[in-house]
Amino acid sequence: MLSKEWTGNLVGLMHNEKITNIQLAEKLGVTDRYVSMVLNGHREPDGAEQRFRAAVDELIRERKT
């Protein structure tokens, strides 16, 4: 399966901001395994890009305040 470009960009941003799959999963209310499946392109749920980006943005904002 080919990973979407957005997942690569998001993984890079998460790495730069030191955000883990576990932290993202907690923010989204899902398991870290599910986060991994989506980011690795094994799952492509509707609206995932928007939900995942919003959660990462929120985690970044929370750290800066």
Language-model-detected regions and their locations in the chain:
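Recognition helix of helix-turn-helix/homeodomain-like DNA-binding domains
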Residues: 31-44
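DNA major-groove recognition helix of helix-turn-helix/homeodomain DNA-binding modules
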Residues: 48-65
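A short, Lys/Arg-rich alpha-helix, primarily the initiator
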Residues: 1-16, 62
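Short alpha-helical "recognition helix" segments of helix-turn-helix
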Residues: 24-25
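Helix-turn-helix DNA-binding elements, focusing on the entry/boundary residues of the two helices
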Residues: 10, 21, 32
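N-terminal flexible/basic segments that precede or flank functional cores
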Residues: 1-2, 43, 52-55
